[in-house]
């Protein structure tokens, strides 16, 4: 790794500032999904075992910066963490002027987004945060694409900055899939809009042998192949881009299996009847909400040949059971594959949970935007600053 990891750093009797991703759902003062909290436990436990004091920082939701708002308070998260780790977790509401913490203790700081200057990573705020600790640990890959005070600025001014266990695992898994993949490699890029994934598709074309498109993205490709998509979600102004991607794929020998059959409905509704049709038979008042059985078979067959699979996005409206078959078939094909598989993005994780394949995916990324930017080949500011610190 081109940056320091937690295990490279002496933590004994050090105040260790850890940027975690505790942006979790809270309802009636209770955390309803603890996945992101659980993901940070190895880093927290390691620091405690090494004799360090833990100061945790995170954002929660999107409050108005510099204004306290109780609905975005991290106090319920501190309670949930205490239950999971079976240790007291102190909560610091006002923490910028100093945090009282001893070796072996954990303090959860209030929402970083209540601080003025967080998003712009002002020098004033960054220096203030850096002064609270001896070591900074970045362990929130989900926010690594943002140069903010608690992810980037603090690393600039603190004596030692390194990557936590979760962040290190994320980078290793993604680099294994993208920089040194075992071939053949397949990528699945789904979701509603091609515009948000265009640079991902272009970046992956040079790396994969199979590129599977799904959702609204696939509809734009179906249109690019000259078929009518009726009332379906697609992007007319990006049909030309889709045509270019298909031509480029052909020249590079990349297989893009555009759906040959689909499940359509007359309305976007959970109870709408799913009708299976060839793509050539879709009419004006129908909308494509899932791929059909033939397309499922083609995808499953292609994935059997892959040694590396990268998955971001569903291939249909899997939240509606009538239109979940395509994403279910895709999920099961990945689960049954011998390939090294990496999955990321909110909808993808929801599909993994719905179809019960969590243990069959090699690595599940907790990130959304940062995962996408990594797939685009972009540099992530919070990772770059760790690399710079390692050189100094």
From Swiss-Prot:
Keywords noted in UniProt: ATP-binding, Cytoplasm, Glycolysis, Kinase, Nucleotide-binding, Transferase
Chain positions recorded as substrate binding sites: 21-23, 36, 59-62, 113, 146
Signal sequence, start to end: none
Disulfide bonds: none
Biochemical pathway: Carbohydrate degradation; glycolysis; pyruvate from D-glyceraldehyde 3-phosphate: step 2/5
Chief location category: cytoplasm
InterPro entries named among the record's database cross-references: Phosphoglycerate_kinase, Phosphoglycerate_kinase_CS, Phosphoglycerate_kinase_N, Phosphoglycerate_kinase_sf
Molecular function per GO: ADP binding; ATP binding; phosphoglycerate kinase activity
Domain of life: Bacteria
EC numbers, comma separated: 2.7.2.3
Cited Gene3D superfamilies: Phosphoglycerate kinase, N-terminal domain
HAMAP family per record: Phosphoglyc_kinase (MF_00145)
Protein name: Phosphoglycerate kinase
Organism of origin: Francisella tularensis subsp. mediasiatica (strain FSC147)
């Amino acid at each position: 790794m081109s940056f320091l990891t937690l295990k490279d750093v002496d933590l004994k009797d050090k105040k260790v500032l850890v940027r975690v991703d505790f942006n979790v759902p809270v309802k009636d003062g209770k955390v309803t999904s603890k996945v992101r909290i659980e993901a940070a436990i190895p880093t927290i436990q390691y620091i405690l075992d090494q004799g360090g004091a833990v100061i945790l920082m995170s954002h929660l939701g999107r409050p108005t910066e510099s204004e306290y708002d109780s609905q975005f308070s991290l106090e319920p998260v501190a309670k949930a963490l205490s239950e999971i780790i079976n240790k007291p977790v102190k909560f610091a509401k006002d923490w910028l002027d100093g945090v009282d913490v001893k070796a072996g203790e954990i303090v959860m700081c209030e929402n970083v987004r209540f601080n003025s200057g967080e998003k712009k990573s002002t020098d004033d705020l960054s220096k203030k945060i850096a002064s609270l600790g001896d070591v900074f640990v970045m362990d929130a890959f989900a926010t690594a694409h943002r140069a903010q005070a608690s992810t980037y600025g603090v690393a600039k001014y603190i004596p030692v900055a390194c990557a936590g266990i979760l962040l290190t695992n994320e980078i290793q898994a993604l680099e294994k899939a993208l920089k040194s993949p075992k071939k053949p490699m397949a990528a699945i890029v789904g979701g509603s809009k091609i515009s948000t994934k265009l640079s991902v598709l272009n970046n992956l074309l040079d790396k994969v042998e199979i590129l599977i498109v799904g959702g609204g993205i696939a509809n734009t490709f179906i249109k690019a192949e000259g078929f009518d998509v009726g009332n379906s979600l697609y992007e007319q102004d990006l049909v030309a881009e889709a045509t270019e991607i298909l031509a480029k794929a052909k020249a590079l020998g990349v297989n893009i299996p555009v759906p040959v059959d689909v499940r359509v409905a007359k309305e976007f509704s959970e109870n709408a009847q799913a009708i299976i049709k060839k793509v050539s038979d879709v009419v004006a008042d129908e909308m494509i909400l899932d791929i059909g059985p033939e397309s499922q078979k083609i995808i499953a067959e292609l994935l059997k040949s892959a040694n590396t699979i990268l998955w971001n996005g569903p291939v249909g409206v899997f939240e509606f059971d009538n239109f979940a078959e395509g994403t279910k078939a895709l999920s099961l094909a990945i689960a049954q594959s011998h390939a090294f598989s990496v999955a990321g993005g909110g909808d993808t994780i929801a599909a993994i949970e719905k179809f019960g394949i969590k243990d069959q995916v090699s690595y599940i990324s907790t990130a959304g935007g940062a995962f996408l930017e990594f797939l685009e080949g972009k540099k992530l500011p919070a990772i770059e600053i760790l690399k710079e610190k390692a050189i100094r």
